[in-house]
């Protein structure tokens, strides 16, 4: 989808929600709609969209002269940025801004009567970003393929008796660059009872026989993120570990299978959550089933009980049920999925999900 098609999609949602003008200051939103490489800076860049125009407002030092189908309006270091922005807005209409629009630019903007009111435009922006076009879908596939390659190496190249969580995490992070990532990967490595901490920080715990080894990892590739979680067991596995692993894996598969035409985000969450709740472990599944993913690791949007939005073609999100037993261990199994044109799930991760005992 080219830039103008993304802008056209935004305009459709603007009309749906009664927004006549939208001003964006979040560089991620700006990059999605322009591909201009905007970044957070004291020389801020803005994107202004109405039903008839799309305009980049940028400091002339940054130097953009043309962008596909868009006007470019420059201001200088000596200009009052908010006054410059106000010159381009419709003053007798509400102005929608994105949720991360910097307050230091928004509050002074009111002094220039740039609009009758200021409202959030995130609903329209986020719905457009949620529907990945063919280019984005391919980039997400490639990022997940990279994650699969790293996880394959992890099984044989990282762990040994006595290695610490931090040492393992650092070793895995380096592998991402070797496999084509934009930067070293992020990696949660948790041993034993640490795996019962949903967002554990790798520390000095040392690997020992019988430990659950939980690995949650990813990195962007060509700007689009990967994310995958796999649990392993070191040298042996108990019956209780095996029971929980089997339960969580079945919940993961149930969530993925629930992606069907007409399904809502809350339905997908319920398919996995109900399976875990049935044998009495529901209170140990303490988080949403998944999050949207794309230019951000956590794109706006959740697969969660309260989200009644329909699951639609082009959406990309994680499916990551877990059971966390305090003081014992935790198990989470996570894949990324894209909703296909027929409304079902394409699983992006092809790394094995069968129970594995490492170190034998």
Label the predicted regions.
Residues 1-360:
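Active-site neighborhoods and metal-handling regions in enzymes and metal-associated proteins
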């Amino acid at each position: 989808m080219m830039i103008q098609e993304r802008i056209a999609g935004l305009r459709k949602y603007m009309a749906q929600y009664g927004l006549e003008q939208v001003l964006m200051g979040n560089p991620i939103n700006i990059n999605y709609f322009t591909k201009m490489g905007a970044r957070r800076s004291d020389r801020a860049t803005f994107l202004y969209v109405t039903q008839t125009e799309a305009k980049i407002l940028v400091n002339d030092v940054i130097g953009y002269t043309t962008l596909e189908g868009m006007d470019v309006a420059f201001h200088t270091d000596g200009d009052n940025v908010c006054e410059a922005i106000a010159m381009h807005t419709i003053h007798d209409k509400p102005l929608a801004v994105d949720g991360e629009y910097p307050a230091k630019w928004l509050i002074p903007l009111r002094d220039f009567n740039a609009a009758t009111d200021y409202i959030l435009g995130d609903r329209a922006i986020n719905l457009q970003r949620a529907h990945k076009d063919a280019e984005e879908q391919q980039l997400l596939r490639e990022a997940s393929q990279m994650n699969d390659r790293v996880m394959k190496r992890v099984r044989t190249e990282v762990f040994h008796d006595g290695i610490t969580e931090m040492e393992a995490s650092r070793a895995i992070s380096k592998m991402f660059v070797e496999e084509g990532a934009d930067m070293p990967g992020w990696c949660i490595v948790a041993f034993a009872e640490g795996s019962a901490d949903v967002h554990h920080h790798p520390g000095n715990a040392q690997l020992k026989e019988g430990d659950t080894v939980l690995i949650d990892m990813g990195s962007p590739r060509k700007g689009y993120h990967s994310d995958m979680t796999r649990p392993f067991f070191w040298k042996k596995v108990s019956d209780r570990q095996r029971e929980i692993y089997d339960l969580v894996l079945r919940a993961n598969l149930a969530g993925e299978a629930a992606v069907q035409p007409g399904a809502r985000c809350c339905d997908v969450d319920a398919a996995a959550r109900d399976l875990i709740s049935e044998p009495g472990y529901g209170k140990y599944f303490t988080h949403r089933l998944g999050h949207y993913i794309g230019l951000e690791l956590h794109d706006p949007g959740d697969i969660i009980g309260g989200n009644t939005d329909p699951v639609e073609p082009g959406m990309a999100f994680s499916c990551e049920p877990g059971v966390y037993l305090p003081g014992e261990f935790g198990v989470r199994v996570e894949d990324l999925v894209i909703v296909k044109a027929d409304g079902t799930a394409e699983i992006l991760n092809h790394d094995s999900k069968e129970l594995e005992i490492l170190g034998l």
